[in-house]
Amino acid sequence: MKEDRVVFIFGPTAVGKSNILFHFPKNKAEIINVDSIQVYKEFNIASSKPSKNLMKHIKHHLVDFLDPEKDYTIGIFYEQALKIVKEIRQKKKIPIFVGGTAFYFKHLKDGFPSTPLVTSKIRIYVNNLLELKGKSYLLKELKNVDPIRFNMLNKNDIYRIKRSLEVYYQTGIPISQFQKKQNSEFKNIVIIGLKRSFEDLKTRISIRINEMLNSGLLSEIKGLFSKGYNENTPAFKGIGYNEFLLWKSRPCYGLNDIIGLINKNSFLYAKRQMTFFAKISDVLWLHPEDDLDNILNLIFKVDKEI
């Protein structure tokens, strides 16, 4: 058995990733979800979590397990994913990574940077610095402790600014001095990219948003607000949720404005996803419907070689 053999299936939002899985035989594979918002509990509709029927058909991992107030990082995902792959292999099944978070796929394929994990105490400390002293202070501090990293970063990339300082405060070593990446844990990967025309994606995104509204998205949003979730809640960074923060804070934004904004942001996100995915090598690009038989044959080929 080739323990490091895995399958990647990725593509932009609304391309039709989940539909393919219904065609996969039961008990042949398990899915490792690659989505930074679907991990959160309670944030169900706009995140387009896999349906109960799909999760009954094929077991899914890393879906609907995390408190919405907690951060979810690439480091946490990577560590969890490696553990789950081993568990799936022990069951003689195929581990299939499915999702749209391109950054996660990149590190699964190329290897994860060997920077250390950071304690919650350090994260809270850096967040407090940001809240009390502002981004300009963090930039000044980063320039002092790690000028190499400072010159590399987009000065509006607050996530990486915070991450750089967290690593320094945790270890006393600039993040720029750590090895940039290690070798991938996976040596044999079948990579399937799903594609559609942008016009087709645009139509499907619009249909999906209407389906979300019909499924009770507004009630879900109101329920989340009533529980105290707000702009500081990590789960609210997702498209389809973040836009409703405007609805709450600025009465001039009507529901139609918010829906239009979700449509716009979703399509722009799909374009960014495709741009990022295009940088990943060794991808076989296929249409989720026209090439369905080819997709299933590729996966069954892996099955036969195990």
Curated annotation (Swiss-Prot):
Q: Which residues bind ATP?
A: 11-18
Question: Where does the entry annotate site (Interaction with substrate tRNA)?
Answer: 101, 123
What's the top EC group for this one? transferase
Residue positions annotated to bind substrate are 13-18
Q: EC?
A: 2.5.1.75
Note the InterPro entries from the entry: Dimethylallyltransferase, IPT, P-loop_NTPase
Q: Name one Pfam family in it.
A: IPPT
Q: Which domain of life is it from?
A: Bacteria
Query: Which protein is depicted?
Result: tRNA dimethylallyltransferase
Q: Which organism is it from?
A: Borreliella burgdorferi (strain ZS7) (Borrelia burgdorferi)
Q: List the lineage, top down.
A: Bacteria, Pseudomonadati, Spirochaetota, Spirochaetia, Spirochaetales
What gene name is given for the protein in this entry? miaA
